[in-house]
């Protein structure tokens, strides 16, 4: 067990946490509360990876959808409009008809 792991286990036990995961979750929540720029960056990363929708990312960032769109534009991140190409649409339709 590494020194860091042992320290985390000790802090979790001393703090009354069920396990280190619970303690780390609380620590991350507190970090994001204190540093809103990290919260925004996390939301951008989750949006870019496809883990969350635009609306959910804005909610996570604590900003309006329009403000989040502006942030994406400021960072040079293109948004997928969600439109299908003709080929994708035909493929979906064919699958649906089967």
Swiss-Prot record:
InterPro entries the UniProt entry points to: UPF0175 (IPR005368), UPF0175_domain (IPR052264)
Any matching Pfam family: UPF0175
Recorded superkingdom: Archaea
Family note: Belongs to the UPF0175 family.
The protein's name in its UniProt record: UPF0175 protein VNG_0066H
The organism of origin for this protein: Halobacterium salinarum (strain ATCC 700922 / JCM 11081 / NRC-1) (Halobacterium halobium)
